[in-house]
Regions:
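Glycine-centered tight-turn and secondary-structure capping sites
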Residues: 26-31, 71
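FKBP-type peptidyl-prolyl cis-trans isomerase
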Residues: 7-13, 30-38, 61, 75-92
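Short beta-strand-initiation
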Residues: 4, 71-72
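Well-structured core secondary-structure elements of compact alpha/beta domains
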Residues: 1-26, 41-56, 86-93
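Short, conserved secondary-structure segments in the cores of folded domains
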Residues: 20, 73-75
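Short clusters of hydrophobic/aromatic residues that line enzyme substrate/ligand-binding pockets
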Residues: 49-52, 65, 73
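Cell-wall glycan
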Residues: 59-69
Length: 93
């Protein structure tokens, strides 16, 4: 069974999500940005979500996490919770 590890940042607006993505692409540390801006409790841990399999997260997450590039900031991804930046840190098929 496939497994992946990822971290994310959750914010309310697409605009904020894009602004944070730009900061990270310009050299800001993903974990620091998550701690400062993410509205998800995982933000306190730098956005770390741990390891999970398909179907354990919302559909929009699964599509990105199990198909997107590893170690690249992906998003904005819109879910019922808001807008996410995702970084897949590892994946096993």
């Amino acid at each position: 069974m496939s497994k992946a590890s990822a971290r994310h940042i959750l914010v309310k607006t697409e605009e904020e999500c894009n602004a944070l993505k730009q900061q990270i692409e310009e050299g800001a540390d993903f974990a620091d940005v998550a701690k400062e801006h993410s509205t998800c409790p995982s933000g306190r841990k730098g956005g770390e979500l741990g390891t999970f399999g398909p179907g354990q997260m919302v559909k929009e997450f699964d599509e990105v996490v199990f198909n997107g590039e590893i170690n690249t900031v992906l998003g904005p991804v819109k879910t019922q919770f808001g807008y996410h930046l995702l970084e897949v840190t590892s994946r096993e098929d």
